[in-house]
């Protein structure tokens, strides 16, 4: 894991397996099925790092040989909240890692001015819960900012929120950091820039279209 000095709340997960799989996702000839599988696999690998600092306690268990005080995750419960629609493809990988997590949804679409328009919010109970927001792309950053806003407006502490994406543009990361400097953002790659259509370069195209086999 590495950081960029420009963005103190950004964490880039540069594990070789993540980078290898991301390269295949970038390939325009990768099939919808393979794209979907790779997204799930990368998210699972990223989830390992994202959950690294969950608090631990112990409980007494009986092995076939003896009783022992063994480590278990303590305290806060987890919720996975994909930003629709492309974020759905990431939730399965996180659920593979933490199958007991609750799942919420935040639905936004990008208007002509690239600003997010909210059309759905469904969340589990908020008390004493860590929320993992997920969306494959942080391009302009506005949708990511909006998703965090949704939780903060409901009094979820910043310390209980993380955002995870595959690729991000520096422009979007700056927008996110300006709005939420107290929320950690995890990505697999910080790409070069946004083009005139607000697409990440080099990026991987429209993640939702490639995930679901649709055309914009």
From Swiss-Prot:
| Lineage of the species this protein comes from | Bacteria, Pseudomonadati, Pseudomonadota, Betaproteobacteria, Burkholderiales
Q: What is this protein called?
A: Uracil phosphoribosyltransferase
Biological function: Catalyzes the conversion of uracil and 5-phospho-alpha-D-ribose 1-diphosphate (PRPP) to UMP and diphosphate.
Source organism (scientific name): Burkholderia vietnamiensis (strain G4 / LMG 22486) (Burkholderia cepacia (strain R1808))
Q: List GO BP terms, alphabetically.
A: UMP salvage; uracil salvage
Q: Name one GO molecular function term.
A: uracil phosphoribosyltransferase activity
**Binding-site list for uracil:** 200, 205-207
A single Pfam family it belongs to is: UPRTase
* Gene coding for it: upp
Protein activity control:
Allosterically activated by GTP.
């Amino acid at each position: 894991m590495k950081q960029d000095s420009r963005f103190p709340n950004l964490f880039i997960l540069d594990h070789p397996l993540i980078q290898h799989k991301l390269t295949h996702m970038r390939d325009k000839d990768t099939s919808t099925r393979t794209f979907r599988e790779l997204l799930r696999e990368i998210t699972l690998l990223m989830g390992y790092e994202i959950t690294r600092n969950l608090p631990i306690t112990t409980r007494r268990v009986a092995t076939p040989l003896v009783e022992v005080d063994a480590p278990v995750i303590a305290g806060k419960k987890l919720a996975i909240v994909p930003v629709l629609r492309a974020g759905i493809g990431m939730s399965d990988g996180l659920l593979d890692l933490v199958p007991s997590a609750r799942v919420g949804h935040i639905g936004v679409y990008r208007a002509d001015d690239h600003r997010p328009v909210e059309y759905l919010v469904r969340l589990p109970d908020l008390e004493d819960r860590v929320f993992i927001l997920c969306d494959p792309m942080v391009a302009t950053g506005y949708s990511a900012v909006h998703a965090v806003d949704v939780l903060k407006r409901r009094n979820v502490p910043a310390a209980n929120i993380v955002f995870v994406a595959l690729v991000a543009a520096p422009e979007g990361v700056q927008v996110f950091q300006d709005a939420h400097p107290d929320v950690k953002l995890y990505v697999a790659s910080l790409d070069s820039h946004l083009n005139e259509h607000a697409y990440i370069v080099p990026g991987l195209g429209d993640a939702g279209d490639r995930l679901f086999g649709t055309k914009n």
